[in-house]
Amino acid sequence: MVLFRGLKPAFKKVNKIKTKLDLHSVRTADDLLNTKDNLKFVKAVKLLIKPSTRFNRFYLSTIRKFAEFVQNITENQCGFFSQEIGFLERGLERSSRTLALCLKYFFPEEVNFANISSKDALWIYATFTAALFLDIGKIAVKYSITLFHKK
């Protein structure tokens, strides 16, 4: 079994704050994406991206790799409306909304992205990945994650 630990923010190490050891198993992309909210966001993306071969080849593979990278790490939000939400759910929500906005404002006569040119499809994919990966640097900056085998 492969585990990862160190989901406490890195500043706790610097300030020598004692925290309990927290171990989490590394999960597969299918396992991570198989939640009600995540399935809803993936379905929203799939409905917009046509043909389905384009979705399966580009979008789904990117979503799966993103899910395996961020796992179930939570993103802490500070402020008046503070909440704890996972990087995966936040990225999927942001990217699905971005695709819907692109369709509405750049292609108002279209129902989905089936009839757009290859050049436009590339721009839409770039916009999708930018929205999905927006906060991915926070994982490297805020967290210290160690991967090890339990034996």
Task: List each model region and its residues.
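N-terminal low-structure segments adjacent to metalloprotease catalytic domains
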Residues: M1-L21
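Acidic/His-rich, divalent-metal-binding segments that scaffold phosphate/diphosphate chemistry
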Residues: K18-K151
